[in-house]
Curated annotation (Swiss-Prot):
Record protein name field: Interleukin-1 alpha
Glycan attachment residues as annotated in the record: N102, N141
Keywords, comma-separated and alphabetical: Acetylation, Cytokine, Cytoplasm, Glycoprotein, Inflammatory response, Mitogen, Nucleus, Phosphoprotein, Pyrogen, Secreted
Keyword Nucleus appears in the UniProt entry: yes
The keyword Lipoprotein appears for this protein: no
Family assignment from sequence similarity: Belongs to the IL-1 family.
Region feature Nuclear localization signal (NLS), mapped onto this chain: 82-86
Organism of origin: Bos taurus (Bovine)
Cleaved signal peptide residues: none
Transmembrane segments: none
InterPro entries the UniProt entry points to: IL-1_alpha, IL-1_CS, IL-1_fam, IL-1_propep, IL1/FGF
Source organism, top-level taxon: Eukaryota
Pfam family for this entry, one: IL1
Gene: IL1A
C-alpha cells in the first residue's frame, strides 16, 4: 500500500525553527501527546463497508450550503438518511417554496416530529411574504370569514368573495425543520391565526408587528403542506393537528375527519 504523504511535515519544520515557540510547547508535551505524533490504526474488517457520503459543501472549508444542497449519510444497514438544510442568506424562489410544500414525505430524519418542549427552543427567522391577500376555501368550497362573536374565524359559502377574509402568508425558516413554517395574518392588520388544542377554535392574536424571530410563540406557526391541488396547515406547536373547518363550527384544530383539513389558496 502506498504511503500517505505527511501533510504536516512542512508545518513542523517551520515551527521547529522558532526556538521560543519550541520551548513554550515543550512543557505541554509532558502531559499531552503531540498532535504530530498521532498514529492511526487501520480500519477493522467489520468497518470496511461503513461510510459516510458527503457532498462538496461538507468537504470545503469555504463553501456555504445553498438552498437545495443536501447532507447525505449512509447508515451501516445501507439505509439512506437525508436532511435538507436552508441557508438564511440564499434567495429562495416561489418554485423552491412550492417544492418544499409538495415534498413533505421526503425526509427520513424528521426533527419536526420532536416533542413540543424541544420545538419551543427552536428559532424561526422571518424570510418573506409569499402570498398577499389570498383567500382560503375548504374542500366544500366554503370561504373563511371573521366570526363576530369574538376573535374567531368560521367558514361559509359566499356568493361574493370580497366578503372573505384576506390572508397574508409569511414564510419563516429554521435550521432544524425541513418543512416550510408560515404564519397566517389577516391582511392590513396585525391579527395572526393562533393554534389551540384539539377541537378548540383557533384565535386571532394581535401582535405589535410581524415577528422577525419566533421562538416562544410557535402557536402562530403552521407547516404549509401541499398535496395535489389541496393545501394543509399543520400546527408547529401541535404537530398532529391541522387548521380545520366543520359545519356549524368555528375554524378549529383537528387531526382529520370528520373535520375538513383540506384548503385551496385563492389569489386575489
Amino acid at each position: 500500500m502506498a504511503k500517505v504523504p505527511d501533510l504536516f511535515e512542512d508545518l513542523k519544520n517551520c515551527y521547529s525553527e522558532n526556538e521560543d515557540y519550541s520551548s513554550e510547547i515543550d512543557h505541554l508535551s509532558l502531559n499531552q501527546k503531540s498532535f504530530y505524533d498521532a498514529s492511526y490504526e487501520p480500519l477493522r474488517e467489520d468497518q470496511m463497508n461503513k461510510f459516510m457520503s458527503l457532498d462538496t459543501s461538507e468537504t470545503s472549508k469555504t463553501s456555504k450550503l445553498s438552498f437545495k444542497e443536501n447532507v447525505v449519510m449512509v447508515a451501516a444497514s445501507g439505509k439512506i438518511l437525508k436532511k435538507r438544510r436552508l441557508s438564511l442568506n440564499q434567495f429562495i424562489t416561489d418554485d423552491d417554496l412550492e417544492a418544499i410544500a409538495n415534498n413533505t414525505e421526503e425526509e427520513i430524519i424528521k426533527p419536526r416530529s420532536a416533542h413540543y418542549s424541544f420545538q419551543s427552543n427552536v428559532k424561526y427567522n422571518f424570510m418573506r411574504v409569499i402570498h398577499q391577500e389570498c383567500i382560503l376555501n375548504d374542500a366544500l368550497n366554503q370561504s373563511i370569514i371573521r366570526d363576530m362573536s369574538g376573535p374567531y374565524l368560521t367558514a361559509t359559502t359566499l356568493n361574493n368573495l370580497e366578503e372573505a377574509v384576506k390572508f397574508d402568508m409569511v414564510a419563516y425558516v429554521s435550521e432544524e425543520d425541513s418543512q416550510l413554517p408560515v404564519t397566517l395574518r389577516i391582511s392590513k392588520t396585525q391579527l395572526f391565526v393562533s393554534a389551540q388544542n384539539e377541537d378548540e377554535p383557533v384565535l386571532l392574536k394581535e401582535m405589535p408587528e410581524t415577528p422577525k424571530i419566533i421562538k416562544d410563540e410557535t402557536n402562530l406557526l403552521f407547516f404549509w403542506e401541499k398535496h395535489g391541488s389541496m393545501d394543509y396547515f399543520k400546527s408547529v406547536a401541535h404537530p398532529k393537528l391541522f387548521i380545520a373547518t366543520k359545519q356549524e363550527k368555528l375554524v378549529h384544530m383537528a387531526s382529520g375527519p370528520p373535520s375538513i383539513t383540506d384548503f385551496q389558496i385563492l389569489e386575489k
